Swiss-Prot record:
GO biological process entries: oxidative phosphorylation
Function: Component of the cytochrome c oxidase, the last enzyme in the mitochondrial electron transport chain which drives oxidative phosphorylation. The respiratory chain contains 3 multisubunit complexes succinate dehydrogenase (complex II, CII), ubiquinol-cytochrome c oxidoreductase (cytochrome b-c1 complex, complex III, CIII) and cytochrome c oxidase (complex IV, CIV), that cooperate to transfer electrons derived from NADH and succinate to molecular oxygen, creating an electrochemical gradient over the inner membrane that drives transmembrane transport and the ATP synthase.
Subunit details: Component of the cytochrome c oxidase (complex IV, CIV), a multisubunit enzyme composed of 14 subunits. The complex is composed of a catalytic core of 3 subunits MT-CO1, MT-CO2 and MT-CO3, encoded in the mitochondrial DNA, and 11 supernumerary subunits COX4I, COX5A, COX5B, COX6A, COX6B, COX6C, COX7A, COX7B, COX7C, COX8 and NDUFA4, which are encoded in the nuclear genome.
Family per record: Belongs to the cytochrome c oxidase subunit 6A family.
Superkingdom: Eukaryota
Tissue expression pattern: Liver specific isoform.
Signal peptide: none
GO cellular component, one term: mitochondrial inner membrane
Source organism per UniProt: Canis lupus familiaris (Dog)
Keyword terms of this UniProt record: Membrane, Mitochondrion, Mitochondrion inner membrane, Oxidoreductase, Transmembrane, Transmembrane helix
Primary location group: mitochondrion
UniProt-recorded name of the protein: Cytochrome c oxidase subunit 6A1, mitochondrial
Pathway: Energy metabolism; oxidative phosphorylation
GO molecular function: oxidoreductase activity
Length: 20
C-alpha cells in the first residue's frame, strides 16, 4: 500500500499489536 495511507496504518497497527 504505497498510496493508501489508511490501509498501511491499519497494517502497522495490527503488526504492532502482534509485536506487543
Amino acid at each position: 500500500s504505497s498510496g493508501a495511507h489508511g490501509e498501511e496504518g491499519s497494517a502497522r497497527m495490527x503488526k504492532a499489536l502482534t509485536y506487543f
